[in-house]
Amino acid sequence: MSAIITDQLRILNAKNFVSAATSSVNSYYSFVGLPNATNYSSTWESNPPAPKDSFEQEDDYWDTMIALKKINSSDVRMMVSKNTWTSGITYDMYRNDISRTNTAKPSGATSLYSSKYFVVNEDYKVYICLQNGTDPENVSGRPSLDQPTFTDLEPKAAGDSGDGYIWKYLYTIKPSDIAKFDSTNFMPVPDDWETSTANASVRDNASNSGQLKIATIINRGAGIGTANRTY
């Protein structure tokens, strides 16, 4: 029988792992070992093999360990894909209906979490794209020309190029997290996003009910007259 492992289940598993790794009940360690690599491939650095999940392999790990380091709460963060804002790139926009039958435009992603609807700028500020210039003439959006840099609560355009993009500011990555966790392909999510008073205004602004921030016109219609007529 087939099963669907949803994105929400993956997020829950990640949260549970972080919670377990940072609690006082469990202890996690990172180790180095394998002092005699004669029998192993020299291409591991660029092409590591898939791990063998067996009791024999686990015994080998223990037998060849040299040193361990305990993982503390400051050593763990949840991570997301890193989309560094670049001029001329067409980004996806946030939509709650992305699926295999209704893919993101223009990336073709089959789920919200695999689409490129958020970016980080050169100052490590993170934004969600609420509108990517989609209109009846540009059904897959337009290239982004203005880098978002603002920290306003309300969504807005990043500049005056007229690229059609509307961005919403989320958070700024802490310098300590940048130094420890930032990489080419992934960036950290704040560990105190849900509790920090510094993020409270952004959280509250994003969760108020009854808001309509973006309206996208996908069909202008026909035969409806001009705007200066009375009906």
Report residues per predicted region:
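Feature for peripheral, non-core segments
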Residues: 1-126, 130-231
